[in-house]
């Protein structure tokens, strides 16, 4: 077997292999002998068909199969010998072949990039320092009460966090635009569901009033024909409702899994959940900065085959979220996922090198701690822990999470870390908008 390797472009490689004629003929003869033992041909007993008859009947197809098998086996031998690490499915390109002669063919494929990490000590990370205060717990309790609130109709003027029922008709230059009209529209104010200025124009009016408000659509509004346009809305205010918050009674508190129904127990449970969320938010905030720094410091070529594979994964995930099937997943535009797919591939390659060069292995104690932390959010944590223990795939997934964390911490140990005190709400708002 003769082998030559050349670079086509970037990570592209072409291996050219020549298989000697005697190797081919020996393999063909061996396969024909095996075939002669199995084939049935009229006029001959099984296993007694003469070789020349078998060769005449099956020789061409056997030779084709032999060449295909030799192409694959010799390619594998070649990349092992040349220490080549291919990515994705190779493209086999057969050359001209005449019976009795050598056979030359090519295989084109991509290889993994050589990654040599650099600039780790120049990565800058701002680590949030946060604690859950009593005031934070008070705010969260108020949020829980608002989520469980009921609505009561009122005669007073609408306020910023009321719920209103309205009819409205929107127009631009006197012409009603598509989607600008609704009847009995229920609007919970204070949630920024409408364009800027709309809710402000409703505040101060009472049920039964008819009025108009002038607003401007944002420049980045999703509808192209409305971007930046001045509009007028004619509004009929039909109903104003105010929120009635539930008292922190024993019955109310027990809804949140606090067995004794005490306010102290509820505060403790809320604080525990907030601290768990906080821990995850800090971890993710730091991780994002580490990964951004790692990517910026290490520009690498990315195999197209890996990006294509990741795009397929993202397509399927997107389709599943919206109840789609495999066919619908493949119809989703590639451009929607290309940037995210490339980032994920780059991160995987860089962290893979961190893991390899530092000989990292998943810390089982960390794996167990991650499972326990995740399970603590469920009603029966022990049941979740036992479920993970019995499910090999889930357990391996958690090992990968732990190993990734260890790789991030390895990079973080070499980075420039500055601590910054922030409030709970500030951090969680940053996380929500990231």
UniProtKB/Swiss-Prot annotation:
Cellular localization per UniProt: Cytoplasm
Catalytic activity reported: [protein]-peptidylproline (omega=180) = [protein]-peptidylproline (omega=0)
GO biological process: 'de novo' cotranslational protein folding; cell division; chaperone-mediated protein folding; protein transport; protein unfolding
GO molecular function annotation: peptidyl-prolyl cis-trans isomerase activity; protein folding chaperone; ribosome binding
Cellular-component GO terms for this entry: cytoplasm
Alphabetized Pfam families for the sequence: FKBP_C, Trigger_C, Trigger_N
Domain of life per record: Bacteria
Domain PPIase FKBP-type: 161-246
Keywords attached to this entry: Cell cycle, Cell division, Chaperone, Cytoplasm, Isomerase, Rotamase
InterPro entries: PPIase_dom_sf, PPIase_FKBP_dom, Trig_fac, Trigger_fac_C, Trigger_fac_C_sf, Trigger_fac_ribosome-bd_bac, Trigger_fac_ribosome-bd_sf, Trigger_fact/SurA_dom_sf
Keyword Isomerase attributed: yes
Enzyme Commission number(s): 5.2.1.8
Function recorded in the entry: Involved in protein export. Acts as a chaperone by maintaining the newly synthesized protein in an open conformation. Functions as a peptidyl-prolyl cis-trans isomerase.
PANTHER family named among the record's database cross-references: TRIGGER FACTOR CHAPERONE AND PEPTIDYL-PROLYL CIS/TRANS ISOMERASE, TRIGGER FACTOR-LIKE PROTEIN TIG, CHLOROPLASTIC
Domain notes: Consists of 3 domains; the N-terminus binds the ribosome, the middle domain has PPIase activity, while the C-terminus has intrinsic chaperone activity on its own.
Sequence similarity: Belongs to the FKBP-type PPIase family. Tig subfamily.
The protein's name: Trigger factor
Organism in which the protein naturally occurs: Pectobacterium carotovorum subsp. carotovorum (strain PC1)
């Amino acid at each position: 077997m003769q082998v030559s390797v050349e670079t086509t472009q970037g990570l592209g490689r072409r291996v050219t292999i020549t298989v000697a004629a005697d190797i081919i003929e020996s393999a063909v003869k061996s396969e024909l002998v095996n075939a002669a033992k199995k084939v049935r041909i009229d006029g001959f007993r099984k296993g007694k068909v003469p070789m020349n008859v078998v060769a005449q009947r099956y020789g061409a197809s056997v030779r084709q199969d032999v060449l295909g098998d030799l192409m694959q086996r010799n390619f594998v031998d070649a990349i092992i010998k040349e220490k080549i690490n291919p990515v994705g499915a190779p493209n086999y390109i057969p050359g001209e072949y005449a019976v009795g002669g050598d056979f030359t063919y090519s295989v084109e494929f991509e290889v993994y990039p050589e990654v040599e990490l650099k600039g780790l000590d120049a990565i800058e990370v701002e680590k949030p320092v946060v604690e859950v205060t009593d005031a934070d717990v008070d705010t969260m309790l108020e949020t829980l009460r608002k989520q469980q609130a009921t609505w009561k109709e009122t005669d007073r003027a609408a306020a910023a966090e009321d719920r209103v029922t309205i009819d409205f008709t929107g127009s631009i230059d006197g012409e009603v635009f598509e989607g600008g009209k609704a009847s009995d529209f229920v609007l919970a104010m204070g949630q920024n569901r409408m364009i800027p200025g709309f809710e402000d124009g409703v505040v101060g009016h009472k049920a039964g009033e008819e009025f108009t408000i002038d607003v401007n659509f944002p420049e980045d509004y999703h509808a192209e024909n409305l971007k930046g346009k001045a509009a007028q809305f004619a509004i009929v205010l039909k109903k104003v409702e105010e929120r009635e918050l539930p008292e922190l009674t024993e019955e109310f508190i027990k809804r949140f899994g606090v067995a004794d129904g005490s306010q102290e127990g509820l505060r403790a449970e809320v604080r525990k959940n907030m601290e768990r969320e906080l821990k995850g938010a800090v971890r993710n905030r730091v991780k994002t900065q580490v990964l951004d720094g790692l990517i910026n410091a290490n520009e690498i070529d990315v195999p197209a085959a890996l990006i294509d594979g990741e795009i397929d994964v993202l397509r399927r995930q997107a389709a599943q979220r919206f109840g789609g099937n495999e066919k619908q997943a493949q119809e989703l535009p590639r451009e929607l996922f290309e940037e995210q797919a490339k980032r994920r591939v780059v991160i995987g390659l860089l962290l893979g090198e961190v893991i390899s060069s530092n000989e990292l292995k998943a810390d089982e104690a960390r794996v167990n701690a991650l499972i326990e932390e995740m399970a603590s959010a469920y009603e029966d944590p022990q049941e979740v822990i036992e479920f993970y223990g019995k499910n090999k795939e889930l357990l391996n997934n958690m090992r990968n999470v732990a190993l990734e964390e260890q790789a991030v911490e390895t990079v973080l140990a070499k980075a420039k870390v500055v601590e910054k005190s922030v409030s709970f709400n500030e951090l969680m708002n940053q996380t929500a908008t990231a």
